[in-house]
Amino acid sequence: MLLGFFRLLFKGLYRVRLTGDTQALYQQKVLITPNHVSFLDGILLALFLPVRPVFAVYTSISQRWFMRALTPIIDFVPLDPTKPMSIKHLVRLIEQGRPVVIFPEGRISVSGSLMKIYDGAAFVAAKSQATIVPLRIEGAELTPFSRLKGLVKRRLFPRIQLHLLPPTHLPMPEAPRARDRRKIAGEMLHQIMMEARMAVRPRETLYESLLAAQDRFGARKPCVEDINFQPDTYRKLLTKTLFVARILEKYSQPGEKIGLMLPNAGISAAVIFGAIARGRIPAMMNYTAGVKGLSSAIAAAELNTIFTSRTFLDKGKLWHLPEQLTQVRWVFLEDLKGDITLADKLWIFAHLLAPRLAQVKQQPEDAAMILFTSGSEGNPKGVVHSHKSLLSNVEQIKTIADFTANDRFMSALPLFHSFGLTVGLLTPLLTGAEVFLYPSPLHYRVVPELVYDRNCTVLFGTSTFLANYARFANPYDFYRLRYVVAGAEKLQESTKQLWQDKFGLRILEGYGVTECAPVVSINVPMAAKVGTVGRILPGMDARLLAMPGIDQGGRLQLKGPNIMKGYLRVENPGVLEAPAAENQHGEMEAGWYDTGDIVTFDEQGYVRIQGRAKRFAKIAGEMISLEMVEQVALGASPDKMHATAIKQDASKGEALVLFTTDNELTREALLRYARQHGVPELAVPRDIRWLKQLPVLGSGKPDYVTLKNMVDEAETTHE
């Protein structure tokens, strides 16, 4: 009677809905593992699960008065993690056929993300061999009974959903010591909990995700700021988005691919979301690629119009691009204000009241944006991403990192760079954090000063950029930082040590590729290992393809929701080439993407990058990583830049060419370092060429295409 009354009350107030297959709850041995977001969680499960479970409640909570008051509707047993007998009691209950609920986090989330997972829950699952039923509670974190005050827009009676996920099992790990078995089991349960979060992510478009963020964090919450130092709230960003959306319709057609050549600025975010809302597909133009690279991008994506800014072209000294790229129409944002009419203003006002109506009909699987590869190994390729792939990567990042609305991101990597777009714009916008968009990562004195002035807590960049920020920064500039993330190139040991010594900060290294939107793996405070790029993100499958001549590791192939829709190539303009990869049997498998990177996995699942498959030289029958050669050069000459190319050799097949900005670097110095660090002599180049400055791409990576051309030209001249 009492249970029925409370069930009706909660259903009326919170519109509680239970989804998923409930049959798993009736199996012989069941362990239910929900996330923990509010004080309502236990009551919700007791009221709406079709079985009457036993709740494991920590003794510090079970002894409070309100737990005694809940005794008529909730069965619970005290859990003391310091006493093994309480764990054994839970195992016995499961073996007797009672469904048991354990909150693996052990406490209510204070970030909105998963907290750490206690090993005890995992050990109970493994010891009892119970069927694990993951459960996601969504919506209760918005109530006053959560611990997210100030992080979300709380409301009295939000809609609450209880998602039952497909059942799984957790085998008892094999390890000599019980402590190790518990730890491994805990990591396995953590993976299950992360996969559960990914499984219930909403099906929405990028524009809908912006509206959802506004609803979750509040229309008046500041979200974007740029060098004008006028922060935009979600409401103001939406207003700009609708303005741009309305005007873009006059210059493009639904479904058309349009080029965007814009700096890191608040208006750029509005243009991206505005174009997407009205069914246009923004192609982010890499203005550092030069006329040749941009011509390839324009041809591959079949672009007719590029939107840019006169101010941006003036400050960036980029007017030569529209002057030479005459095959497209150039539209300047400054000219659009004059096109606004009374009808347009009325349309914008009406859609501010009902913003969802501004979006043309779209599906999450539809093409949303086009990014371009760097062209470091040939012509730039258009990488077409769907709403689903981009938002999946954001959700993967949110699942493993505890970013909150209290964070402030410093985003200086360009938005045409996948790292800059997903991590630098979409992730902060959709987690309620505020982002400061700065137009150039090369201003090594300015960026640290802005990090200090704007109280930024998250900074990311390439190893090169982070090293230069550290050189010019005051030791106190980064006092608020809690995440420093390196990606896009290998993190140098000297950079890591400099940040540790000067600022007391640990750089977290990650790995990504444009085709994966881009983050594939990353170290986070909860799971980090020196010398690796972290674990593969939840929701992704990974496999290694064996490579002849390479004993350790193989080519990394990936499959998951964040994989691109496909390539657009200049050789076949406008035709989408869906991802497919060759498996170990020599067959092409659709949906898999071959990264071309040689990696290894350790026993804990951490990834180590060995190098690009294309960046291996076969010398006297041995496979030599060009990246290893560059690491030797950096070890011998840490303050200079180095890059390696390959030339043909009559006696050994291939030979190494080292380009360096150190005019005093000798082979003897390289040999000395190689011998000290166990590097084979074959990896020490004989051909060392000095350059005043290495050719680099906009991302800061060496331009290997140009370097290879320099080698080939020299060989031709020599012949």
UniProtKB/Swiss-Prot annotation:
EC numbers on record: 2.3.1.40, 6.2.1.20
Location of the protein in the cell: Cell inner membrane
InterPro entries: Aas (IPR023775), AMP-bd_C_sf (IPR045851), AMP-binding_CS (IPR020845), AMP-dep_synth/lig_dom (IPR000873), ANL_N_sf (IPR042099), Plipid/glycerol_acylTrfase (IPR002123)
Name of a matching Pfam family: Acyltransferase
Keywords associated with the record: Acyltransferase, ATP-binding, Cell inner membrane, Cell membrane, Ligase, Membrane, Multifunctional enzyme, Nucleotide-binding, Transferase, Transmembrane, Transmembrane helix
Membrane association type: Multi-pass membrane protein
Major site of localization recorded for this protein: membrane
Region of interest (AMP-binding), ranges: 233-646
A GO CC term assigned to this protein in UniProt: plasma membrane
Catalytic reaction equation(s): a 2-acyl-sn-glycero-3-phosphoethanolamine + a fatty acyl-[ACP] = a 1,2-diacyl-sn-glycero-3-phosphoethanolamine + holo-[ACP]; a long-chain fatty acid + holo-[ACP] + ATP = a long-chain fatty acyl-[ACP] + AMP + diphosphate
Keyword Protein transport: no
Region (Acyltransferase): 15-138
Catalytic residues in the record: H36
Membrane-spanning parts: 258-277, 409-433
GO biological process: fatty acid metabolic process; phospholipid biosynthetic process
Molecular function GO terms recorded: acyl-[acyl-carrier-protein]-phospholipid O-acyltransferase activity; ATP binding; long-chain fatty acid [acyl-carrier-protein] ligase activity; medium-chain fatty acid-CoA ligase activity
Record's function text: Plays a role in lysophospholipid acylation. Transfers fatty acids to the 1-position via an enzyme-bound acyl-ACP intermediate in the presence of ATP and magnesium. Its physiological function is to regenerate phosphatidylethanolamine from 2-acyl-glycero-3-phosphoethanolamine (2-acyl-GPE) formed by transacylation reactions or degradation by phospholipase A1.
Family recorded in the similarity comment: In the N-terminal section; belongs to the 2-acyl-GPE acetyltransferase family. In the C-terminal section; belongs to the ATP-dependent AMP-binding enzyme family.
Name used for this protein in its record: Bifunctional protein Aas
Gene: aas
